[in-house]
């Protein structure tokens, strides 16, 4: 991963862990609290408890398992973010052993900012927390490839209207399509022969015009608008959408 994330001097990233396995919660807590600049503010055994704890502990990032009793991680994510779409809402990083496409797409639509498998190396998990806390989006590379391949090839339902891109310029459409294909800002800049700062400007305008909370939601917009129907998946080695 090549994304440098700076949370500011002395900034502490507050993390809440939601997983139904006590050993997993303990392992994640030990890993996170061994790193300067991060602290675990709570641990939940199910989605309902995660929603309750978030209200009182104000985490920056929630590590959310998918399959949990009482309330699964996707529903918990939906409830957390449905009531608070501004910058104060926590960023949700889905962690699971399941890399099935329906989980990825549903999690992103629920508002998750990232999706990683539980066998991700510890250093990559810590990087992911920093990336998510900084407002970027992240998908495990293997998940990104499957998501792109699945939805680029999926036939468009006749009854489902495409998402409107009214007000989006031709150049912004190009950028949005490349975001949907898994490219980082640096890769988009190379692809379109633009300065990376220019790409960042286009991304910022897309976020505003499409009322997207973060880059993960731009990926969903690219699929729902039909931009990828005539394009194959791009080859990207990066899971971080920087």
Write out the residue ranges for each language-model feature.
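Active-site residues of response regulator receiver
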Residues: 19, 65, 96
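Short, flexible helix-to-coil linker/hinge segments that flank and couple to helix-turn-helix
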Residues: 104-109, 114, 119-170, 174, ...
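Acidic catalytic/metal-coordinating carboxylates
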Residues: 46-49, 71-78
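Short hydrophobic/Thr-rich beta-strand motif most characteristic of the beta2 strand and flanking loop
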Residues: 37-45, 53, 212
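Acidic, metal-coordinating helix/loop segments flanking the phosphotransfer/catalytic sites
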Residues: 45-61
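Basic, Lys/Arg-enriched C-terminal extension of HTH/homeodomain DNA-binding domains
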Residues: 207-242
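Receiver (REC) domain active-site loop signature in two-component systems and cognate sites
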Residues: 68
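Recognition helix of helix-turn-helix DNA-binding domains
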Residues: 182-217
């Amino acid at each position: 991963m090549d994304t440098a994330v700076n949370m500011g001097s002395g900034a502490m990233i507050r993390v809440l862990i939601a997983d139904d396995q006590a050993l997993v919660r303990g392992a994640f807590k030990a890993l996170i609290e061994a790193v300067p600049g991060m602290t675990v503010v709570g641990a939940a055994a199910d989605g309902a408890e995660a929603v309750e704890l978030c209200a009182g502990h104000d985490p920056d990032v929630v590590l959310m398992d998918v399959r949990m009793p009482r309330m699964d991680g996707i529903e918990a994510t939906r409830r957390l973010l449905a009531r608070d779409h501004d910058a104060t809402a926590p960023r949700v990083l889905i962690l699971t052993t399941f890399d099935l496409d329906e989980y990825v797409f549903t999690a992103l639509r629920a508002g998750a900012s990232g999706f990683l498998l539980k066998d991700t190396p510890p250093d990559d998990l810590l990087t992911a927390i920093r990336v998510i806390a900084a407002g970027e989006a992240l998908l495990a590379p293997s998940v990104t490839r499957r998501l792109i391949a699945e939805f680029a090839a999926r036939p468009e339902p006749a009854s489902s209207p495409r998402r409107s891109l009214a007000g989006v310029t031709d150049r912004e459409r190009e950028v949005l399509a490349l975001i949907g294909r898994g490219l980082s800002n640096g890769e988009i800049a190379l692809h379109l022969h633009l300065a990376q700062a220019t790409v960042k400007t286009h991304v910022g305008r897309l976020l505003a015009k499409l009322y997207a909370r973060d880059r993960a939601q731009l990926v969903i917009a690219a699929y729902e608008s039909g931009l990828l129907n005539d394009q194959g998946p791009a080859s990207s080695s990066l899971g971080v959408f920087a």
